[in-house]
């Protein structure tokens, strides 16, 4: 077996891991674009020659979830190379592409329309997997397990070949609504592990308290008690956040939960998949905003509301209209996503100003805390190696409170151990 970390050993996002079997089967786990705002002006794989060289001879690509820093190059992969992702993950991205297509249609941008249609066709050709059900690419076996993350339908992967068992965590956390299931998976299903490839996004955060999604929900409820009119700016696909927000709003009788058509489509996708397993993820009563819905506007002014917003021309029209009708002292914007976007995006700063002077920052990470990383390493206790990825170059995995024998297994450079070749870029 050979394990290559093409990218991710010294950066967050854009991770690319390759696993080769002795028989010559080669798979990639994630093929994502660098995160926006990074020091690199361009992603080197934006160059078709570099991407072509990377995927030459690859037997299949498995995506742990649908964030762009894991999935970003999917549409540039030749059809001959099979690509795999969770079924719900695929449908969530199809919803995003459908919304982009609607915008392109309205602006009559032919080249953009064709590009989006092509991406959708490539995504529809994906092979989908289900948590707990094994599939194979050549002689490499893969079994995905659901994990909590800020992207719904995220998975860690158990990968087996040449008599070795490798766990790739993808992105995960314990402080999401379903995060408590992680320990059960680690204890029951991931035994006798040889190699652990784990994210380390939060390594440099120290041991500070990281809020749980339940705490976030409680903070939202408190704000809804203080303010009648609550706008929330967050990712349209952060379903834990949106489900908690919906549940918080439901405690205030008569208050509509308002969104646009696209967001409601995502709610329907969430309900159809995750709603089968938990009522928390049933969001079937959202009301779609329109300037023509005068009765809805009257109800919002009378009862108050929670409205999920994004920065685009349609929402700007709606906000400009609504802010003329609302009492500013009873109105607040809850900013519930990465704070750095406010520093990086001038347009977002302008959008936020539309809501007046009341703003609250209510957010938590989608990634494993140091405590969770320690638990993963300790419970899996890999026999051969621990490979930290998806981490800042300055972060120190050895600063975790794990046993010395586990620290001895942390690999940050190329080597060969117990018949496994490690190549780390």
Spans of model-derived segments:
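Hard-cation-handling environments
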Residues: 205-330, 389
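C-terminal regulatory/interaction regions
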Residues: 11, 251, 285-425
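Catalytic core of the metallo-beta-lactamase
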Residues: 4, 12, 18-22, 131-189
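Extreme N-terminal starter segment of soluble prokaryotic enzymes
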Residues: 1-3, 26
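Active-site neighborhood of phospho(di)ester-bond hydrolases with catalytic His/Asp-centered motifs
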Residues: 7, 28-31, 58-69, 83-87, ...
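Metallo-beta-lactamase
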Residues: 27, 33-35, 93-154, 159-215, 231, 270-296, ...
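Pre-active-site segment of Zn-dependent metallo-hydrolases
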Residues: 11-14, 18-63, 72-76, 85-121, ...
């Amino acid at each position: 077996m050979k394990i290559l970390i093409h990218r991710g050993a010294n950066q967050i996002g854009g991770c690319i891991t390759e696993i080769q079997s002795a028989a010559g089967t080669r798979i990639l786990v994630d093929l994502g674009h660098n995160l926006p705002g990074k020091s690199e002006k361009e992603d080197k794989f934006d160059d078709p020659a570099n991407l072509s060289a990377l995927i030459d001879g690859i037997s299949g690509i498995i995506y742990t979830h649908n964030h762009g820093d894991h999935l970003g190059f999917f549409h540039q992969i030749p059809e001959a190379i099979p690509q795999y992702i969770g079924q719900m993950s695929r449908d969530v991205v199809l919803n995003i592409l459908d919304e982009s297509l609607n915008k392109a249609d309205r602006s009559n941008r032919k080249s953009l329309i064709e590009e989006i249609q092509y991406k959708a066709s490539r995504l529809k050709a994906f092979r989908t997997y289900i948590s707990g059900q094994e599939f194979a690419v050549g002689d490499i076996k893969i079994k995905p397990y659901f994990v909590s993350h800020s992207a719904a339908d995220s998975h860690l992967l158990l990968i087996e070949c040449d008599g070795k068992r490798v766990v790739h965590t993808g992105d995960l956390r314990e402080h999401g609504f379903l995060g408590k299931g992680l320990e059960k998976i680690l204890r029951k299903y991931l035994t006798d592990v040889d190699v652990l490839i784990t994210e380390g996004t939060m390594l440099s955060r120290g041991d500070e308290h990281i809020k749980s999604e339940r705490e976030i929900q409680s903070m939202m409820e408190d704000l809804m008690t203080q303010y009648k009119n609550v706008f929330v700016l967050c990712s349209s696909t952060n379903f834990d956040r949106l489900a908690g927000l919906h549940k918080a709003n439901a405690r205030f009788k008569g208050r509509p939960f308002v969104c646009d058509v696209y967001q409601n489509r995502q709610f329907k996708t969430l309900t159809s998949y995750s709603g089968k397993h938990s009522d928390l993820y049933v969001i079937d009563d959202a009301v779609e905003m329109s300037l023509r819905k005068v009765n809805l506007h009257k109800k919002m002014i009378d009862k108050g509301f929670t409205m999920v917003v994004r920065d685009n021309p349609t929402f700007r029209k709606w906000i400009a209209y609504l802010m003329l009708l609302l009492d500013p002292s009873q109105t607040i914007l809850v900013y519930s996503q990465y704070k750095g976007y406010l520093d990086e995006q001038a347009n977002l700063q302008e959008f936020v100003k539309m809501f007046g002077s009341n703003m609250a920052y209510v957010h938590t990470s989608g990634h494993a805390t140091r405590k969770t990383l320690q638990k993963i390493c300790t419970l899996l206790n890999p026999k051969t190696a621990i490979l930290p990825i998806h981490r800042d170059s300055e972060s120190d995995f050895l600063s975790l409170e794990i046993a010395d024998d586990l620290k001895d297994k942390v690999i940050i450079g190329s080597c060969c151990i117990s018949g496994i070749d490690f190549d780390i870029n």
